[in-house]
Regions:
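Surface-exposed beta-strand/loop patches in extracellular or lumenal glycoproteins
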Residues: 739-759
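N-terminal extracellular ligand-recognition/capping segment immediately after the signal peptide
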Residues: 34-55, 59-71, 240, 247, ...
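Extracellular beta-strand/beta-solenoid scaffold signature
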Residues: 67-75, 94-103, 118-126, 140-151, ...
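Secretory targeting signatures
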Residues: 1-10, 27, 56, 84, ...
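Right-handed parallel beta-helix/beta-spiral solenoid domain characteristic of secreted/periplasmic
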Residues: 54-97, 315, 351-401, 490-512, ...
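Short, T/G/N/S-enriched strand-turn elements that build extracellular solenoid repeat scaffolds
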Residues: 24-31, 44-51, 56, 77, ...
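Consensus "Asn ladder" position of solenoid repeat domains
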Residues: 87, 114, 136, 161, ...
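Acidic Gly/Asp/Thr-rich repetitive segments characteristic of extracellular carbohydrate-active
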Residues: 7-49, 306-343, 347
């Protein structure tokens, strides 16, 4: 027994009576019909009979406990118009006549917001009418007995209860015209059972999942349930979705309302309409779901019912697009989307918030058709989705993306997975947007692309394993004036997006994934390795800067200069890019000594004038050099090797293809060398107006020599492979090791600065043991350098180049040493 507790009884006249009782039954006995008995928190070890029209209200469902002590039904209701609310009811003991709460022939009763466990029939309506069972939590623990059982009852409602771990979750037996709606039924043997002739019941909007035997069952031996309407339920991961041995029930609410969601349904949604033969998606499967041999769900849902809800109107929808299209959905509303796979193309043209339940499990999949999610309004927020499988077409920009933000401002895209699209996230002429905490991976073109879109904020996005991870394109500073911090990464390396930097050096940094320089002066970029981006290095309005020894691979553009002047792009390797090096609206730059190729364009100039392209090797591209509306550029000493179109000019004039002495090497050039100087006898025709007057007959190479603190260049044109080059400062000797195929002839055309060697020059091959077939040591001299030319038969050779005015004693020693060495070799 417990000590007396203070109960508050409010009678039908509104009078408050505070009185002490040692049991709930004592308080019931004292109360008048129509009273409300408020029960204070405690554990009451008793079984009670409610035989009056009263409301029995517990102070707190967790702490107001009625324990039946395993002796039988805990709360027995035998009067009409009784309310039981706010209790924990437990320990009825086992037996088919034992319940947690039972109404016996009692009508118009309400059982709400109670907790029941360790009872056989947790809640049982027995021969009752017009009762309401809602908001109760039933968790039996050991899967014994029934959760909620309706026996020979009519016009009752069972709503929004949680029912778990029973033999049967919700059970009908000879009951009719009842409504079961919005319940959560899980981890039972059977989710919902219909026995005997239970008919004309409405079972809707329940979630029935993870039940070990089946979602619903109609056992034949107990009669034939008929004319029940069952729709908008979600049957998820039950061992058997449904077991039935009769027919005559209705499994959908017609079109377009739809039927039920079946997790085992494997149909598709490409069509709509009552006959599912009209083009378009509607969230309903295109084929029926066979419930049994006799019955079918004609309009199975593609996602659990209620997954898409307008939080402002509380309306539910079958597709995200139908929620957006609804006239009840207006600017400022929030649409919440539950976990599931939504096969649709979403167009957000209202100022809405789309909120996914979980970014890993709330999936919008367009089945490789078109753009997955398009934003065509301002002030749209999209958060918490996986967005995947756009189409793969390459039409006008804007089609076939994961997320396409089109001419929109004030939008936010956050906490999304964006994968396996043509373009992951695409901002198109869109400003003042925030893109943050997204994981963008495995997209077939760009991971994240900004096209003429400025004043956007990108924060903490992980961009990886896309063909081109990040690309920012535009035409003016306003397009590039974005805030993109180092919290963004490409393939695990930080993005460096810098505006207004001066006198900075970026050298040997392994933690740079991509480098954007906007409005910068006197910046040096050196020894970086950059791959798979829209640009490796991008410069907008950058002056007096230098980019050297950068390796930029597999990007849309390796190195890109836009509206930039007075820069040097030197000795970089740009391979397997769409364009190796591009100059757009950029003048008076030097592009020298770079290796570019294996792409569509090696070097591209677009409206770029007065630039110098020298000593670059451009190979294996569709276009070696391409000029569009670019004028007065100097292009020489470049090696154009096996490009499909070596040079292509569109509306470009006054460009010079040689320096007045030497031009470029063209691997497809057919030419002769009658005067033996390493240059073709005939000009190389580029088009009717452009010619290389002095085409090189083989590859051009330049070797830098550091002499007394200054850099001098030794320039070599040779059809031999140069294995090594050395200049000996103390002896003024140049040494080369070369080779070439046996039984062929090689040549060298070499330009030697006078500072490194007196203009009168001699050449020895293999210490004089290999014959020089032809020589001309005074091909040309401009007062600063001497050009020489000589030929030989190919093998592996050491070539020594010396000045004829080398100190006489030194020359004599060299000749004697060479003679003695030759004699010794003969003696051997």
């Amino acid at each position: 027994a417990i000590s007396p507790q203070s109960f508050l009884i409010v009678n039908s006249r509104g009078e408050y009576i505070q009185q002490n009782f040692v049991s709930i039954q004592e308080a019931i006995n004292e109360a008048e019909n129509g009273s409300t008995v408020n029960v204070p928190s405690n554990t009451y070890f008793e079984r009670i009979i409610v035989n009056k029209t009263i409301s029995l209200v517990g102070e707190d469902a967790v702490t107001t406990i009625i324990d039946g002590g395993l002796g039988g039904t805990v709360v027995d209701v035998v009067a009409d118009n009784v309310t039981i609310v706010g209790f924990t009811i437990q320990n009825s003991g086992w037996g088919w006549d034992r319940s947690g709460i039972e109404t016996q022939g009692a009508d118009n009763c309400r059982i709400e917001n109670n907790i029941l466990f360790h009872t056989c029939h947790n809640i049982r309506l027995n021969g009752s009418r017009n009762c309401f069972v809602a908001g109760n939590k039933i968790d039996h623990v050991n899967q014994m007995g029934y959760g909620i059982r309706l026996t020979e009852s009519t016009n009752c409602t069972v709503s929004n209860n949680f029912v778990a771990q029973n033999i049967g979750g919700i059970v009908f037996e000879n009951s009719s015209n009842c409504t079961v709606v919005g319940n959560n039924v899980t981890r039972n043997s059977d989710g919902i059972r219909l026995y005997s002739s239970s008919s004309n019941n409405r079972i809707t909007a329940n979630i029935v999942y993870n039940n070990s035997y089946c979602g619903m069952i109609y056992p034949l031996q107990y009669g034939y349930p008929e004319d029940n309407t069952i729709f908008h339920n979600s049957f998820i991961n039950n061992t058997n979705p449904f077991i039935i041995q009769s027919g005559g029930n209705i499994w959908d609410d017609g079109y377009p309302s739809g039927g039920n969601y079946w997790s085992y349904y494997n149909g598709t949604d490409f069509f709509k309409g009552p006959f599912q033969n009209e083009t378009g998606r509607d969230g309903i499967g295109d084929t029926y779901y066979a419930v049994n041999y006799f019955e079918a769900d004609r309009y199975p849902l593609m996602n659990p019912y209620g997954s898409i809800r307008n939080l402002d109107t509380n309306l539910t929808y079958l597709t995200i697009q139908s929620a957006i299209d609804s006239s009840e959905t207006i600017n400022g509303h929030t649409l919440r989307v539950g976990s599931g796979v939504y096969h649709e193309n979403v167009n957000v043209y209202k100022s809405l918030t789309l909120m996914g339940e979980n970014q890993a499990t709330t999936i919008i999949d367009s089945d490789e058709i078109g753009t997955v999610l398009s934003v065509n309004a301002d002030n749209v927020s999209v958060v918490g989705f996986a967005i995947q499988n756009s189409g793969s077409l390459f039409p006008t920009y804007g089609d076939d993306c994961g997320v396409f933000i089109n001419h929109s401002t004030g939008c936010k895209l956050s906490d999304c997975f964006v994968t396996n699209n043509r373009i992951g996230i695409y901002l198109f002429f869109s400003q003042n947007n925030i893109v943050e905490r997204n994981i963008v991976s495995s997209n077939r073109e760009n991971g994240m692309l900004l096209w003429y879109s400025g004043n956007n904020v990108l924060r903490h996005n992980e961009i990886s394993n896309n063909s081109y991870n990040l690309g920012v394109f535009g035409g003016s500073f306003s397009d590039f004036n974005n805030t993109i911090d180092v919290g963004n990464t490409v393939d695990g390396k930080p993005v460096q997006y810098l505006i207004g930097v001066e006198n900075e050096i970026f050298e040997n940094r392994t933690n740079i994934g991509v480098l954007y320089l906007i409005n910068c002066i006197n910046v040096t970029v050196r020894n970086l390795n950059l791959t798979r981006n829209g640009h490796g290095v991008f410069c907008f309005n950058v002056t007096n800067s230098k980019i050297e020894n950068v390796t930029a691979l597999e990007s849309s553009y390796g190195i890109y200069l836009q509206d930039s002047s007075g820069n040097i792009v030197y000795n970089n390797v740009c391979l397997k890019n769409w364009v190796g090096i591009c100059l757009q609206d950029s003048d008076y730059n030097i592009v020298e000594g770079n290796i570019v190729g294996d792409g569509e364009k090696g070097i591209s100039l677009y409206e770029a004038d007065n630039n110098n392209l020298e000593g670059n090797t451009i190979l294996y591209s569709l276009y070696g050099i391409r000029l569009y509306s670019s004028h007065s550029n100097e292009i020489f000493h470049n090696n154009l090797i096996e490009n499909a179109i070596q040079a292509d000019l569109i509306a470009s004039y006054s460009n010079v293809w040689d320096n007045g002495l030497e031009g470029n090497y063209w691997s497809n050039g057919a030419n002769s060398d009658a005067n033996k100087d390493g240059l073709g006898d005939l000009p190389q025709t580029i088009d009717d107006y452009n010619h290389d007057r002095y085409p090189l007959l083989s590859i051009f190479k330049k070797f830098r020599v550091d002499y007394e603190g200054r850099i001098y260049n030794v320039k070599i044109i040779s059809n031999s492979t140069i294995l090594s080059f050395a200049y000996e400062n103390n002896s003024y000797i140049i040494r080369l090791t070369i080779n070439g195929p046996n039984q062929t002839y090689g040549f060298c055309r070499i330009c030697v600065p006078h500072t490194l060697m007196e203009p009168e020059i001699s050449v020895l091959i293999d210490d004089g043991l290999t014959e020089i077939l032809y020589s001309n040591y005074s091909v040309y001299d401009d007062g600063f350098s001497r050009w020489i030319y000589f030929t030989y038969q190919h093998s592996t050779h050491e070539i020594v180049i010396v000045s004829e005015f080398w100190p006489v004693i030194s020359l004599s020693i060299l000749i004697i040493a060479t003679f003695l060495l030759a004699m010794l070799r003969k003696l051997k």
